[in-house]
Regions:
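A contiguous active-site-proximal alpha/beta segment in oxidoreductase catalytic domains
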Residues: 153-215
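NAD(P)-dependent dehydrogenases' Rossmann-like dinucleotide-binding region
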Residues: 176-179, 195-216, 230, 234-238, ...
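N-terminal secretory signal peptides and thylakoid transit peptides that target proteins
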Residues: 1-17
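C-terminal helix-rich "cap/oligomerization" subdomain common to oxidoreductases
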Residues: 12-22, 27-51, 122-124, 353-392
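Beta-loop-alpha module in the N-terminal Rossmann-like domain of NAD(P)-dependent dehydrogenases
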Residues: 91, 105-165
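Contiguous beta-strand/loop segments that form the cofactor/metal-binding neighborhood of enzyme cores
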Residues: 36-47, 240-320, 350-361
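Mid-domain beta-loop-alpha active-site segment that forms a flexible
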Residues: 69, 176-184, 216-252, 269-271, ...
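N-terminal Rossmann-like dinucleotide-binding module
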Residues: 28-101
Length: 392
């Protein structure tokens, strides 16, 4: 057979012609596949115990439905909901949805009614993002603690004012980064990291696609001056995880970039962003976007990868496109095995811990300085981000 015909023959028969030459062991390994240990994480022994502490709290601002899970978390921890105030008359649905979830709670006449009520110890809030820090400052200056939806602060100037007020009042300015604090797989990952399951954490990688669902979005959603920009907004969830899992107390931004790829009719909007960060506890990479396709079935395929010196963890938080049902999937590889852990039974500790913090003047549920460090990082990344332009 001449060389040209030989080449044509080999191309025609393809890789199948090489199969007889492969050792039997190769087929045995491929057939056996990886041996994955399947586990189901157990709830805390006291998961159904009555809350240890109780407080009275109110809600101000209903412009993001995160306020429903924020309120529920405080109630789980022993919070008694006293009153609610809708700060946006253009959003009557916010109040209707809140009352449908929490019943016929008293509707306050105005902000002062809540701030001047000495029985109220905490205000939880989800107004339009640019209003959150000014509201939190007023709350703290009235002797109450504050729990904001993310982003809790959208400018470096607001951050400086918040830090100043915390120092002067001794009150707590908490931000509910729900993608860690209210995700069971993320809670389990924290326990594993703390126990040394993967050695020292080297890097976190967060991939956080979201679904834009444009018809449901209010005008402020498209304006970075109101919501802070994509890195400040949905990036804050992710950088909170970098700070927490690496244990960083000092950190900075190495690089950041943003783009508006798909929404020319909303020229100020940002639908893509990413950033690299580094701290005294490790490194981190974050990618955020508004490109979740309808076919996924949930709002986003959120992933977290935690690299350690002795193993790594992957979280598939809300969906597993490999076929496992539901969310809260954790995969861990260490020196001994490959493990899959179903985390749906894990107890969410934030509510009880946070109510305890309000009573005891502690920071168990969320470290105050870490929350502000995560915020500072995304604000710097947002401010200094390179604006990308792609060929249309």
């Amino acid at each position: 057979m001449d060389p040209v015909n030989r080449r044509l023959f080999m191309k025609a028969v393809g890789p199948a012609s090489l199969l007889p030459a492969l050792p039997e062991a190769a087929f045995a390994f491929q057939a056996a596949g990886p041996q994955i240990v399947n586990e189901v994480a157990a709830p805390q022994p006291d998961a159904n115990a009555k809350p240890k502490y109780s407080i009275k709290f109110a809600v101000i601002g209903l412009d993001h439905n995160h306020i429903l899970s924020i309120t529920a978390a405080v109630q789980r921890g022993g919070g008694e909901l006293v009153s609610v105030l809708n700060t946006n008359p253009a959003n009557p649905k916010g109040l209707a949805d809140f009352q449908a979830r929490f019943g016929n709670v008293k509707v306050a006449r105005n902000e002062d009614e809540i701030l001047n009520d000495p029985a109220i110890q905490l205000v939880a809030a989800a107004p339009i993002p640019d209003q959150r820090a000014p509201l939190g400052i007023r709350v703290m200056r009235h002797g109450k603690d504050y729990l904001s939806d993310k982003p809790g602060i959208i400018t470096l100037e607001q951050l400086a004012d918040v830090r100043k007020t915390i120092k002067e009042t001794g009150r707590t300015y908490a931000i509910l980064f729900s993608e860690r604090l209210e995700v069971k797989a993320a809670v389990k990952a924290g326990d594993l990291v703390k126990a040394g399951a993967i050695g020292k954490v080297v890097q976190t990688v967060n991939l956080a696609p979201h679904q834009v669902n444009a018809p449901s979005r209010p005008d402020w959603f498209w304006d970075p001056a109101r919501y802070g920009g994509i890195l400040c907004d949905i990036g804050s969830h992710q950088v909170d995880q970098f700070v927490f899992y690496t244990g960083s107390t000092v950190a900075d931004v190495a690089a950041s970039q943003i783009a508006n790829v798909h929404y020319p009719s909303q020229p100020k909007f940002q639908d893509f962003g990413d950033m690299m960060v580094h701290g005294n506890g490790g490194a981190g990479y974050v990618r955020v976007d508004w490109f979740t396709p309808d076919g996924l079935g949930v709002w986003g395929d959120g992933r977290l990868f935690i690299l350690g010196t002795e193993g790594y963890i992957e979280l598939r938080k809300y969906v597993d496109i490999a076929g496992r049902k539901g969310g809260n999937h954790l995969l861990l590889v260490d020196k001994k095995a490959q493990r899959y852990i179903d985390c749906n039974n894990v107890t969410l500790p934030f509510g009880p811990q946070f109510v305890g913090d309000v009573v005891n003047r502690t920071h168990v549920a969320q470290d105050q300085e870490q929350a502000l460090l995560a915020t500072e990082l995304v604000l710097k990344a947002q401010k200094n981000a390179k604006r990308l332009q792609f060929i249309s």
